[in-house]
Amino acid sequence: MFRNYIKTAIRNIRRNKLYSVLNVAGLAIGVTCCLLILLYVQDELSYDRFHEKADRIFRVATIIDLKDRHMNFASTAHVQGPMFKDEFPEIENYVRFNYYGSRRVIQYKDRSFTEEKFIWADNSIFEIFSFNLLKGNPESALVEPNTVVITEEMAEKYFGQEDPVGKNLRVHNETLYMVTGVMENIPMNSHFRPDFFASFSTLDLKPTGNPAEDLMSNIDYITFVLLREGTDYKELEGKFMGFVERILKPLLDAYEGEARYELDPLTRIYLHSERQGELEQTGDIAYIYLFSGIGLFILLLACLNFMNLSTARSANRAKEVGLRKVVGAQRRQLIKQFIGESMILTITAFVIALVLVTFTMPLFNSISGKTLTMEYFTKLQFVAGFFCLFVLVSFIGGSYPAFFLSAFRPVEVLQGRLRRGTKSSVLRVALVSLQFTVSIVLIIGTLMVDKQLNFVRNRKLGYNKDHVIALRIRNEETQKKYEAIKTELLRHPNIMSVTASSSLPLGRNSFSAHHAVGKPESELTMLFSQIVDEDFIDTYDIEIVKGRNFSKDFPTDRKEAVIINEAAVRKLGWQDNPLGQQIEVFMSLD
């Protein structure tokens, strides 16, 4: 009997080639889009879950509230890890990262490259994180100063077939770092992927003896802690308040501020963190919800299209249903037949969808910035999900046509008196209306995203970023030769201006407490600042509303002059006349 259902279904599909092609094509395209989105979402949700101790790894975050500024840092001071481990027995170990200025010029013999991901880390990194060393001893690889562990990729890049261990890399043409280990390339689904881990002891950081100042100064270090088994991290967070009260309260009271520390679960950082100073760019859980919704909408649209095409042909198949009922076919047999046809069309569409995913994945990767592969399709969880999706789509896509067609009365059909009930008409209209609604929602959403991207690309930033090339100069010897380099560059006919600054206009700037002279010392204003030369304003085409630019004609400008923006004027309360006012820098948090 089942074989007859299949034969009949295949004959009907062959007899209606155009309808079958349209149905399969629509469903295949919809499933293709849904699968690509599913792969993207699955990859985003998998970040940092490959670490064996992921459920016990937490990042320490610093939150500081002053009267005119809320600071939410992903970083801490360098003393945070050691102090917390000594203070709280729930903390088994810690690891610190210093990533500020992570771009470095690395040299080995005649090979020299500028690397973007050079950071310092404690040796405990290999105990806490699942970064596997292929060469070297994880217990001592980063204990000594001026040692470095590199990835497989970097080992091949600099050393080729040589054994890197024991060799020296020159950093910024100054410091030599001995390679003490080679580790596997860090997986793409890690929220930070350095190529070089240099020993934290190289930085030679020592406490000043004033714990409060140590904790509130230079909040530039990412600190992860490994909690002991069974520790409730929320309870531990509550204990941090006693630590703050005991050590930081006098300093915070002087600035009329508050501070607290929070723990971020490792597996939530990539999608849920909204803190300043992340190791690398993170994702956003809102996009996961958005793309998941889009994927479901597309799949729903494909199913609705499948159902509408099937019901639209109901009149053409009415006589077939009537004849089958006359010769004894029962309704449940007809339902099985139509569901069988739906399953054949669906499985054909799914197979085509898998082929389309294979061919479109490189394009999708280039657009999304991912490195997705078909490997995920071989996992049991995907196979189970794919089968459930197939059954669901087959049933949803074929259920209404099956129940609708099988309900025809044979006498009315054969006598040409087929009447379509009001309920059926209403349902078909509802399906078509829903299909158009989903389509319109997707189109409007696409247009909104496009307009938002155009706004971001074209919004005015307050400075000119076009035709500007930025070069980082870390080497002190090169910095001393800046004026000579500047003079040489300006000789080129295509270079109009050259300037130097401590950071880019929207880069990582110094963050400090400022006091307006003449006001009570308790009134502090937190401001970002950077050091620039007299050509900075002109190079970036920044408009000066009041006053003048820095000038070499005024030697005091180099140490005693500042230019502030309109936002700083409002914060300092100088709306009437900011020119000639004086400010002092108190506490620095960078």
Role assignments for model-derived ranges:
Residues 279-298, 380-381, 385:
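N-terminal membrane-entry
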Residues 122-135, 146-283, 484-590:
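Mid-to-C-terminal secondary-structure elements
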Residues 13-16, 23, 44, 60, ...:
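Generic structural signal for small/hydrophobic residues in well-ordered secondary structure
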Residues 37-103, 212, 216-224, 237-238, ...:
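Membrane-proximal extracellular/periplasmic loop immediately following the first transmembrane helix
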Residues 1-21, 278-280, 310-351, 358-479, ...:
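Alpha-helical transmembrane segments of integral membrane proteins
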Residues 32-35, 294, 298-301, 351, ...:
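Residue-level signal for the membrane-embedded core of alpha-helical transmembrane segments
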Residues 25-29, 139-143, 552-557:
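Glycine-rich loop motifs involved in handling phospho/adenylate chemistry
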